[in-house]
Amino acid sequence: KTFVEEINSEELVLNGKKRWVGNASLAGLLIVWAKNPKNKNIEGYLVDAKTPGVTVNIIQGKLSLRMVQNCDIEFKNVKIKKSDKLTKANNFQESVSRSLLFSRLGVSLGAVGASLGIYDEAVKYCTERVQFGKRLTSFQLTQTKLAKIMANSQAMLLYSKRMGEMYLKGKATGGNIGMLKAWCTEKARENAMLGRELLGGNGILIENNIMKHMLDIETLHTYEGTYDINMLVAGKELTGINALR
């Protein structure tokens, strides 16, 4: 939890912690959402990363999406100016919900890319691998699993394309995009499982990339809203009943 309080007519003090902030270690400026006890709103502020009291630490030991330096940030009596408040960032829910439409759409397409990467690795391996005097691609079960991965991937791509078109027209809702993100990442997990099975024991080797895709997909399935939360957002729109507690 992060809070901002008034010191005087020109300054505020910021206290709290944030976790899993992407590439914060590289940032010169931080966009920080903090609760204002005075008006009960969660507001957005622009904070210089070098301001005294700001501590940024890279989260170590990640197995997934390692290209992103996720960080813990602590704010301890950080003084900022009232003018550092982002003018239109007065309500976290309203402000972030709009950006989540775009980011969740991007995650869905990321799941498509990972799935197609899995297919490429699997079909290459199964074409080259010979067992019982035959290439793996000549076996029925191999073809069935490859076809399932491709069918899932094509469905994910077309679904994402449709939602992207609705987004550009301003017609996509939070439920539309939430359901898309949840469904695509769920199918991507299935694709990763099938791809790993096709490579047998070799599927766990780094050189074959399947496990890398699998681990990255686990992050896609969780961030920008978990599967359950996104489906509940969709469920609220479908039924008119808010089951989020």
Identify the role of each PLM range.
Residues 5-6, 22-26, 36-39, 63-67, ...:
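Solvent-exposed alpha-helices and their adjacent loops that cap or buttress functional pockets
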Residues 5, 32-35, 46-48, 74-76, ...:
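Short beta-strand-to-turn element immediately C-terminal to the catalytic PLP-Schiff-base lysine
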Residues 76-95:
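Long, acidic (Asp/Glu-rich), low-complexity accessory segments flanking structured domains
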Residues 7-12, 98-245:
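Alpha-helical interface subdomain recognition
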Residues 11, 15-56:
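A short core secondary-structure module
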Residues 1-3:
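Hydrophobic/aromatic beta-strand elements that line small-molecule binding cavities or substrate pockets
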